[in-house]
Amino acid sequence: MDNGSSVRGGRPWLALLVISMFLQASCSSVSQTRDALRTAEVCCDDFAAMSFPAIHSVNPSDTPVVVELNDRSPVYSFSTGKSYFSAYALSHGQPGSDLLLMFAPGRFNALNSGTFCPIVTYLNSQHEPIASEDLVIRWVSADQSRSGYWTAAQTVPAAASYLIVHTSDEMLSRQLSIDAVTENQTIMVGYAVATIPVTRAAGYQCLPVGEVQVILLG
């Protein structure tokens, strides 16, 4: 007897139960990351009290600076909302250059996933925030699948002396969408389970934690 076909054909409720459990676990994970940020203590009262290690410029083929924000990262209450952050000092020649951020979906499980959605705050030499252009976010994928990453490009303001990578309340209220994603989907056909290719949009909830690669082009 084929035990696998017995499960697929005779117990459709089992597949539905597993799907329900995955969805509950993913929602719980999203909620837990946000609750941890909400209750975390801020590191300092102003920008001047932050630590600013130097950030090096790289060529496109070089290894980027990897920023990983999690519940062990410092926290600050920005004007855009409370966030984990990573701060850097700019050296001579870096203001006015191009900044490229690269980040990818981070799965909680196969059915639901999220991604860290970065923004950048620039400070002048007096640790005062200065205006900058909006980040332009694009999805990059060779085969129109979930195997890809986002890029966010920006020009570093000429007056900038420091940069801070973090997120915002506005970002955390959003989803980043990918159009025309093709993936296999499991459906119920009578009492049987079938897998079919489906092309649709995919949405990724913005999270306060995750990893982003920072490329400051020299």
What are these regions (language model features)?
Residues 69-93:
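Non-catalytic, beta-strand-enriched accessory regions in extracellular/secretory proteins
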Residues 27-43:
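Bacterial Sec signal peptide processing site at the extreme N-terminus
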Residues 111-118:
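Short coil-to-beta strand junction motifs in C2/discoidin
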Residues 3-14:
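Bacterial N-terminal signal peptides that target proteins for export
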Residues 95-98, 155-177:
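Noncatalytic modules at the cell exterior or secretory-pathway interfaces
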Residues 95-111:
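Short amphipathic, basic-aromatic surface patches that mediate peripheral association
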Residues 171-189, 197-216:
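Edge beta-strands of jelly-roll/beta-sandwich modules across compartments, strongly enriched
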Residues 15-24:
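Bacterial N-terminal signal peptides
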